[in-house]
Amino acid sequence: GEFNPAWGYRFNENKLLLDPYAKAISGKCRNDDNLLLAYDVNAPGKDLTLDDRDSSRVMPKGVVMGDDFDWQGDRHPDLQLNDLIIYEVHAKGFTAHKSSGVKNPGTYLGFIEKIPYLKELGVNAVELLPVHEYYVEDFLIQKGLTNYWGYNTIGFFAPESSYGTETSPGCQVREFKTMVRELHRAGIEVILDVVFNHSAEGNELGPTVCFRGIDNRSYYLLTGPRDAPRRYYMNYTGCGNSMNLAAAPVIRLVLDSLR
């Protein structure tokens, strides 16, 4: 690939990239020493300059997952929209506090333990706030904070790993599927809040961990002055970038994720 940011090409062979279709991600992105940035932060040209340091030691890795999960004949309840009583909920926050009384607080399995409570409320659908794998922005980490809500997706096919009960690769996938299966068994629909309008890579000064390094010009809406017509990102989302939902690869990714 080519590294010519002024024209929208941001491939850097020194930066390990996540597979956009990874079904599970092991580890979290850590921008130690700015290794996730494809450019030299100390150079006058900033994002126009190439950083040749290897990022592999601070990058999470995609996990190959089999399709052998036992759904036990699961089917979603198929309730009519006008019959839904929807409970919007954060998958972790629902049981994170010790007062929830669950064995595994703040996890997919802990969520299962509260199904009787949902039934008692008369709820027949849960709308989960983002459960895709997400990236915690550098400026938050520097302040000792985190992105609690998860609206900063980096893996549109991978359940958030920190909501699993173990750190073993793929645990989060099995436990997420178990949660969905048991909610369906209880007659509760599962609705996902998904965020396809932007990714966690931010603007031109953000990390290069996936889409930007693979095909920046296809995945994102770009703009710029005459001498650098695709250097910058259209920021309709207020999150640094906007996914190019007119491009075939992006349309395909979104539809595949929804399916």
Specify the residue positions occupied by each region the protein language model found:
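The feature marks proteins involved in alpha-glucan
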Residues: 1-84, 97-100
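Conserved, well-structured core segments
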Residues: 87
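Substrate-binding/active-site clefts of carbohydrate-active enzymes
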Residues: 55, 90-109, 113-259
